[in-house]
Regions:
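Extracellular loop and loop/strand-boundary signature of outer-membrane beta-barrel proteins
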Residues: 1-3, 36-39, 77-82, 118-124
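Residues that define the transmembrane beta-barrel architecture of outer-membrane proteins
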Residues: 7-13, 42-48, 62, 84-90, ...
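Gram-negative (and chloroplast) outer-membrane scaffold detector with strong preference
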Residues: 11-78, 100, 137
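Short conserved catalytic/interaction loops centered on acidic-Pro-aromatic/His motifs
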Residues: 81, 103-107
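Specific aromatic-rich, kink-prone transmembrane helix
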Residues: 93
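Outer-membrane beta-barrel "beta-signal"
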Residues: 98-100, 126-141
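Transmembrane alpha-helical segments of integral membrane proteins
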Residues: 109-111
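Histidine-centered active-site/metal-ligand motif
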Residues: 114
Length: 141
């Protein structure tokens, strides 16, 4: 923090698959596809293979939740903060899920998406991106 200098702009696609293990806790994984526009065109792809989403309510049509997930990511982005092609990703944040009685629902999340080499090379400055994620979801019962 304080040493990073790159402004990074990207669009993301995060397909997710999860399973509720309790009434409130969902374990899930997600794919990551990032299309960078700034500072130059680049692509990143990876998998966040283990994560959790804790839903505060389970008796309403909507619920706030907290998330945390970790995984691996490959990136072609050439910036000082990422001195490796193969990196790690950590995501944490808060969100709201709306689940209608039938049909698709939606989610909105505010996340911190951290990408770094986890101290395996160089200075390990990493990239922290405050991101807003909105999506459509289906709950299979």
């Amino acid at each position: 923090y304080g040493k990073t200098e790159s402004d990074v702009t990207f669009a993301a696609f995060h397909p997710q698959l999860g399973r509720f293990v309790t009434d409130h806790l969902e374990l899930y994984g997600e794919g990551t596809l990032l299309l960078y526009r700034d500072p130059r065109l680049a692509v990143a792809g990876g998998i966040a293979g283990i994560g959790g989403r804790y839903h505060f309510w389970n008796d309403r049509g909507w619920t706030p939740y907290v998330i945390g997930i970790a995984g691996l990511i490959w990136t072609g982005l050439d910036i000082p903060e990422l001195d490796r092609t193969f990196n790690f990703q950590l995501v944490h944040g808060v969100g709201v899920r709306v689940v209608p009685p039938r049909g698709p629902g939606w989610i909105v999340e505010l996340r911190n998406h951290h990408i770094s080499n986890a101290g395996t090379a160089g200075e390990n400055l990493g990239v922290n991106a405050a991101t807003v994620v909105a999506g459509v979801q289906w709950v299979l019962r």
